[in-house]
Amino acid sequence: MRHYEIVFMVHPDQSEQVPGMIERYTGAITEANGKIHRLEDWGRRQLAYPIQDLHKAHYVLMNVEAPAETIEELETAFRFNDAVLRNMVMRTKVAVTEASPMAKAKDERDSRRGPAGDRSYDEANAEEIAE
């Protein structure tokens, strides 16, 4: 079996359907004895240029190991699903399991926020000290 990196973008109004789509696509891969090495839901992000007068889309990244027939089925499913704006399937030489640069950047932002949620750790401590 070969390794593939798959990215697809979903219409922002259909974001609530993304978990079901992910489950359907990963199910097709695992049924064909494939493996999911990495699955990242990047959420809604700004597009570099408008697609169908849209400025945002919901991004999903998958790194999989699957037979070519299964990948062809996925590409056909992407093509006939109106909610999928764009998709890209690339064959890779090895399985990629480490976090993508997008996921790493998100983790860094989350760790910098500290335990207070949206406020920075210093702001939360300054308020506690002032009281």
UniProtKB/Swiss-Prot annotation:
GO terms for cellular component: cytosolic small ribosomal subunit. Residues 96-131 are annotated as: Disordered. Binds together with bS18 to 16S ribosomal RNA. One of its GO terms (molecular function) is small ribosomal subunit rRNA binding. The keyword Hydrolase does not apply. Coiled coil: none annotated. It comes from the Bacteria. Belongs to the bacterial ribosomal protein bS6 family. This is Small ribosomal subunit protein bS6. The gene is rpsF. Gene3D superfamilies: 3.30.70.60. GO terms for biological process: translation. Keywords: Ribonucleoprotein, Ribosomal protein, RNA-binding, rRNA-binding. Residues 104-122 have a biased composition (Basic and acidic residues). InterPro entries: Ribosomal_bS6, Ribosomal_bS6_sf, Ribosomal_S6_plastid/chlpt, Transl_elong_EF1B/ribsomal_bS6. The lineage of its organism: Bacteria, Pseudomonadati, Pseudomonadota, Gammaproteobacteria, Alteromonadales.
